[in-house]
Every structure is written in C-alpha cells, then in structure tokens.
Amino acid sequence: MSIKVKNITKQFGSQKALNNVSFSVNRPEIVGFLGPNGAGKSTMMKILTTYLSPTSGNAEVNGHAVSNQQKQVQKSVGYLPEHNPLYLDQYVREYLRFNANVYNVDKSRVEEVIELTGLTPEAHKTIGQLSKGYRQRVGLANALLHNPEVLILDEPTTGLDPNQLVDIRQLIKSLGKDKTVFLSTHIMQEVEAMCDRVIIINKGEIVADKKLSELREGQEQTVIVEFDYRVEDAFLLKLPHAKSVKNVHDFIYEIVFDTTTDMRAHVFDFAHDNELKILQLNQKNASLESLFRELTS
C-alpha cells in the first residue's frame, strides 16, 4: 500500500475534524478524496504530508510512519496544498531551481518539469505575473521536482479555465499510470474525469470508499416515461419497486424505483396490460453529484 491510514482522529479543542478514519491507496492508482467544505479533506492531507500530527491513530506513506519518519515521508511525497505558497517576486525557473537545490535534484530535472507542466512559455516571468492557472502549474511542477512516488494534491484544478482544466486532467491521468495520486476536490466532474476510485468524507467520517462503478451499485434507479395522455401518480405507484412518481411535464413522468434492476421492461408490460401507449421510455443514470448529495446531506 502506498498510503495506509488506520483509525486516524484529529481533534481541535472540542471539535473532531477527523473521526476514526481508515483507508488505503495502492500504486498505481488515482483516488479522489471527495467531500463538502469543512469535511476534513485538507486536514487529512496535512497529516499525510506531516504538516499536522493526528490526535490518535496511525498513517503510513510508502511504508514510512507520518508520526516519527517525517523526513522519509516528505522525500517520497509531492504535495500541492490548497493554498499554493509561492514567492511572487521570484522567476518561475529561479523558484524551481531553488527548490531543486533543497531536494538535491539536478537542474536538468527543472527543465523536465517545466516542459511536463506546460510552463515553457511562462518560465521567464515572475510568478506574480502569472495567472491563477499557471501558478497552479508552478505548484504542481514543484511537487514533481524530486520525482516522488506519491502525489498528494489538494484542490489541484482550482482557478483553471476550461482549456487549462483539460491539460491538467490529462497530466494527472498520465502521472497516475505509474504513481499513486491522491487528490481532493468537491467538483464531481473532476473525479469522474480523472479518478479510478473515490473516497467520500463527511463531517470527518468516511461515508463511501469504492470504485466509481461500484459506488453507483445499490442506488435507486429512475425511469423517464411519456404516455399519450395523463396518468394518475397513484396508479403508476402500483409498479413493482416504485418509490415515487413525479409529473415533470405534460404527460412525461419520472418514476424512481428502489432497485438497480432495469425496470423499463416492467414499465412497458405495465403499460401494455393497462392499455397505455408509451411515446418514450428511458433510463436516467444516477450522477455522482446526486450520490454525493445523498451521502453528505
């Protein structure tokens, strides 16, 4: 396991930011750490990067304990914090060369990460002259300098425009082919675009830890059906497993079933038996956003 967290609790006074959290992340794997604001995402990442100590519990990164092997952990981790600390008066290349010296990394690696993160046309500028998106790239380049086995990225796509989003997503996906990438976000589309697996945290506790495909299993199913005339909601509730019915427009109904079995054939048979004509019949896939709301509301 590249990351192993066991029974981590972090308390600030009387408030528990994390409550008995356990999970693991393999290599290579891209895992999205998803949760609403204040759920404990950044706190967990600061513990994994040794910037915070847990109140109780244990965590390991590449086999090194965050509690007493901080230097070994830091050598194996590339960290992009949520609020990316940069020296705005330094030039991009100068800043990266300075940090390369800290890591005892050859200067040639600086040019590699500049090219890898798309910073070549901006490398001659001061960081203060860069847009928010390019500053994020500088932070990511810095995290990659020492070629770490584990990347911990806190809200890595914050402030990026649509074109920059595509570039950074592609970069993170390519890095995830041979590294462990653990990234936090509250944007569902980011998880669906980049991640193999999702861990959802709410109020300091893990509420889901599954592959995206598995997360959708066991959820409700919604069928959209249009008839040629109005049908009473109570009548449609006679369908097996029907949980709720909503008349969304004219003769179009949204029927929610408490099963993952495809219910379209049942709706068709029900309509046929009751001499109802169907004009359209579709299955509405549950979005990660709706599942997120369900798990964190």
Question: Where would I find each of the regions flagged by the language model?
Answer:
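Beta-strand-connecting loop/turn residues
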Residues: 1, 14, 250-251, 275
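ABC transporter nucleotide-binding domains
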Residues: 2-5, 10-202, 206-208
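Residues at or immediately flanking beta-strands
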Residues: 58, 126, 222, 277-280
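Hydrophobic alpha-helical segments typical of transmembrane helices
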Residues: 76, 95, 109, 211, ...
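Alpha-helix N-cap/helix-start and coil->helix boundary motif
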Residues: 93, 188, 230-233, 261, ...
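Surface-exposed charge patches
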Residues: 98, 112, 234, 269, ...
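ABC transporter nucleotide-binding domain
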Residues: 167-256
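C-terminal coupling/interaction segments
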Residues: 259-297
